[in-house]
């Protein structure tokens, strides 16, 4: 049982807690019989029920805005043939959880505003212009957009703006260095050599890796025979093989180096195969 339920059963002083005004008892002349029963908890307030500067809600609404009851357009869940008193009682006889939500969350009655905005928004718990006439739409203020999003977006744009000049400066620096190197090389070399280099670079494509030259069967057989007798070949024997096999001295030397590495690997594989234990 909420605080609003305790206080709504009072007969004389209908004071809504948290609100800035009293509700006149004349507005509740047609309340049901169970609301007129004396409540078990009588709450006495030191405030006077007759405040001269606060006027009843409906009198303010009808006098200030010049709206007649017959011109109200009902667009909510209530039919137009219901009287204003029944509509008011339907709003106040809702479940407790909805009433508390209406009073403390959605309804602007309990806000600390003046009498006119509170009076204009008294029946606005269903939704925007759900029961109220169209003349009350001007008193609904749309929720302002959160300013921190704009601020964060502005900061993000500023950060991007700061990063772009840095990136452009970094990109300009290598290009400037390359220009300096090219100018220095151009100044060091005479113009004739520069023209020759340009012509050579345009005519000759980019140098690729030299193609592999496989040995013939005869060359491999003679090299294997020599490797069988001498793993490390001396210089005289290497020159003799190079003349006989029509190879260069460097080719014979590299072949023996590769053959020794291959033999070492084969010996390790044989040992691992026979022992069954890997050797590291």
UniProtKB/Swiss-Prot annotation:
Subcellular localization: Nucleus
Cited SUPFAM superfamilies: Homeodomain-like
DNA-binding region listed in the record: 208-267
Chief location of this protein within or outside the cell: nucleus
Spans annotated as Disordered: 135-211
Keywords of the record: Developmental protein, DNA-binding, Homeobox, Nucleus, Transcription, Transcription regulation
Basic and acidic residues composition-biased segments: 152-165
Cross-referenced Pfam families: DUF3528 (PF12045), Homeodomain (PF00046)
InterPro entries: DUF3528, HD, HD_metazoa, Homeobox_CS, Homeodomain-like_sf
Function: Sequence-specific transcription factor which is part of a developmental regulatory system that provides cells with specific positional identities on the anterior-posterior axis.
Protein name: Homeobox protein Hox-D11
Organism expressing this protein natively: Gallus gallus
Source organism phylogeny: Eukaryota, Metazoa, Chordata, Craniata, Vertebrata
């Amino acid at each position: 049982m909420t605080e609003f339920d305790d206080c709504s059963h009072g007969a004389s002083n209908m004071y809504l807690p948290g609100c800035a005004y009293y509700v006149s008892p004349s507005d509740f002349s047609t309340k049901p019989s169970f609301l007129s029963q004396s409540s078990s908890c009588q709450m006495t307030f030191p405030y006077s029920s007759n405040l001269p500067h606060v006027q009843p809600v409906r009198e303010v609404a009808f006098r200030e805005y010049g709206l007649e009851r017959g011109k109200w357009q009902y667009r909510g869940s209530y039919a137009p043939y219901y009287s204003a008193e029944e509509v008011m009682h339907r709003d106040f006889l809702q479940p407790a959880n909805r009433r508390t939500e209406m009073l403390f969350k959605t309804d602007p009655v309990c806000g600390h505003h003046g009498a006119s905005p509170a009076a204009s928004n008294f029946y606005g718990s269903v939704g925007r212009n759900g029961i109220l006439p169209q003349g009350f739409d001007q008193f609904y203020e749309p929720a302002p957009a959160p300013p921190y999003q704009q601020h964060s977006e502005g900061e993000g744009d500023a950060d991007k703006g700061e990063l772009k000049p840095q990136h452009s400066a970094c990109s300009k620096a290598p290009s400037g260095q390359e220009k300096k190197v090219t100018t220095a090389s151009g100044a060091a070399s005479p113009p004739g050599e520069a023209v020759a280099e340009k012509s050579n670079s345009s005519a000759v494509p980019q140098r690729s890796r030299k193609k592999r030259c496989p040995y013939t069967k005869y060359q491999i057989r003679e090299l294997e025979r020599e490797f069988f007798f001498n793993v490390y070949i001396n210089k005289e024997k290497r020159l003799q093989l190079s003349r006989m096999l029509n190879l260069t001295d460097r080719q014979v030397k590299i072949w023996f180096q590769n053959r020794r590495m291959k033999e070492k690997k084969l010996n390790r594989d044989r040992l691992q195969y026979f022992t069954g234990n890997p050797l590291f």
